[in-house]
UniProtKB/Swiss-Prot annotation:
It comes from Centruroides sculpturatus. Expressed by the venom gland. It is found in: Secreted. One of its GO terms (cellular component) is extracellular region. Disulfide bonds join 31-84, 35-60, 44-65, 48-67. Has the structural arrangement of an alpha-helix connected to antiparallel beta-sheets by disulfide bonds (CS-alpha/beta). Residues 1-19 form the signal peptide. SUPFAM superfamilies: Scorpion toxin-like. Keywords: Amidation, Disulfide bond, Ion channel impairing toxin, Neurotoxin, Secreted, Signal, Toxin, Voltage-gated sodium channel impairing toxin. This is Toxin CsEv3. The modification Cysteine amide is found at residue 84. Residues 20-85 form the LCN-type CS-alpha/beta domain.
């Protein structure tokens, strides 16, 4: 019983540590999602937790939305072959 509990705890920790994080990016422009209120930010948290993003938590860092707990399928800044504001 103790072994099963330890294995479950380890798997949970591995999933938490290996979760993707990064700046949310607009797929069409290649730019980060901007924000003004640094730290806890309701807008960033809402965007990160949106169904199409799948994150677990979001906040404003360096005037852009930073997300934690993202699935690998969610793109983060920078996008390959796409520069923000450059054509």
């Amino acid at each position: 019983m103790n072994s099963l509990l330890m294995i479950t705890a380890c798997l949970f920790l591995i999933g938490t540590v290996w979760a993707k994080e990064g700046y949310l990016v607009n797929k069409s422009t290649g730019c980060k999602y901007g924000c003004l209120k640094l730290g806890e930010n309701e807008g960033c948290d809402k965007e990160c937790k949106a169904k199409n993003q799948g994150g677990s938590y979001g906040y404003c860092y360096a005037f852009a939305c930073w997300c934690e707990g993202l699935p690998e399928s969610t793109p983060t800044y920078p996008l390959p072959n796409k520069s923000c504001g450059k054509k």
